[in-house]
């Protein structure tokens, strides 16, 4: 299937928040229980058809460790959507979101759609970041917001379609 449009999405955030599983869930509809740190970047692509037009969605999973930050910054260029991910059960990953958002605003096109993603809602009993905190941060920074459970794919595909539709309309 030949595509008409190439759209680049990036996934950013601290290490171990679920970025690699977000890529795996969207591209292959799978979840990997075994954690491994991304070294540099990982990449996946998928063609989708909307209103008779074929879009190739490239999703770039960036390393969350500070060691690789200078390498991963190069991948912000030409992104149409940035998923900024944190772990709802790990306060530090939310506290670090500000720096990821600043990088995104500085290095991505001005038109980039930013989506704040609170992951691991299956760990509700260990929640350290309230839904309200995430929602307020997203509003203040002009971002869309969602909480997901990548383990089951809850909300992810529906939300990726919403982000894509928003881009297509604009």
Task: Report the location of each language-model feature.
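TRAFAC-class small GTPase G-domain
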Residues: 1-170
């Amino acid at each position: 299937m030949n595509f008409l449009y190439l759209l680049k999405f990036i996934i950013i955030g601290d290490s171990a928040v679920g970025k690699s599983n977000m890529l795996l869930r969207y591209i292959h509809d799978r979840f990997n229980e075994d954690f491994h740190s991304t070294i540099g970047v990982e990449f996946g692509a998928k063609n989708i058809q909307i209103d008779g037009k074929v879009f190739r969605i490239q999703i770039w999973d960036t390393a969350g460790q500070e060691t690789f930050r200078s390498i991963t910054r190069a991948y912000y260029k030409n992104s149409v959507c940035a998923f900024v991910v944190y772990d709802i059960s790990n306060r530090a990953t939310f506290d670090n979101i500000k720096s990821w958002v600043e990088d995104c605003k500085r290095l991505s096109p001005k038109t980039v759609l930013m989506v704040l993603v609170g992951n691991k809602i299956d760990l509700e009993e260990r929640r350290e970041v309230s839904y309200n905190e995430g929602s307020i941060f997203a509003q203040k920074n002009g971002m869309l917001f969602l909480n997901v459970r990548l383990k089951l794919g809850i909300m992810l595909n529906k939300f990726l379609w919403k982000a894509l539709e928003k881009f297509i309309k604009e």
